[in-house]
Design a protein with these regions (language model features):
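Short acidic/polar, Gly/Pro-enriched loop/turn segments located at secondary-structure boundaries
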Residues: 7-15, 19-182, 191-193
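Disordered, charged N-terminal biogenesis/targeting segments of membrane/secreted proteins
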Residues: 1-5
Length: 193
């Protein structure tokens, strides 16, 4: 009996040690795999696509990035993308696309002064400068907007599942859920349709 008990103890101890070793190896391997594919949580990382087919990795860019038909596009020290309207020669209908990968986030200031904080796995399409009587952007994913007040030019966010319209306010738009747009209002008023 004593030998049988020792053999059982040895068997179960060896099995537990092997399982623990396999679990530790799997965790290490999967962690390395995830880190190589995705940005770290909260990392200021995004790619900017412009009309001429060029793309810019915003994590590796210096302050000044390029001119968009006379409008200076640059990053400030906080890695925030800005469209400088002071240098704008003319209204520009060119559209840019900001693509934020999994685990990343990125902030930008649009030409009208609206601040946008785009979250992970988000895509924002917007004009270099707003023309006409509306300020329109297109969002897939999630972003926080601090809209510059302009009663004559409403700010409109198009999502795959609806439209959000405001004049000047602070709100969050989330389209991660399938067939659903969630709007969280921090201040002001919005119309959702």
């Amino acid at each position: 009996r004593h030998r049988k008990r020792i053999r059982m103890y040895t068997y179960w101890s060896s099995t537990a040690a092997a399982c623990l070793l396999i679990a530790a190896f799997s965790f290490y391997t999967l962690t390395e795999y995830d880190q190589s594919l995705f940005a770290h949580r909260g990392e200021q990382k995004a790619t900017l696509f412009v009309n001429n087919g060029e793309s810019y990795d915003l994590l590796s860019q210096d302050k000044s990035i390029f001119n968009a038909n006379g409008m200076q596009v640059a990053q400030n020290t906080e890695k925030e993308l800005r469209y400088d309207t002071q240098t704008s020669i003319q209204k520009n209908a060119e559209k840019h696309i900001l693509n934020v990968p999994r685990g990343g986030e990125y902030k930008l200031v649009l030409s009208d002064g609206t601040r946008v904080h785009a979250n992970a796995e988000s895509r924002l399409t917007y004009p270099v400068s707003f023309t006409g009587n509306k300020r329109e952007v297109y969002l897939t994913g999630e972003a926080l907007f601090e809209v510059a007040k302009d009663t004559l030019h409403p700010f409109i966010v198009h999502t795959p599942y609806g439209i959000v319209e405001v004049v000047g306010t602070r709100f969050n738009v989330n389209t991660y859920e399938k067939n659903q747009t969630t709007v969280t209002l921090e201040e002001g008023a919005v119309k959702v349709y």
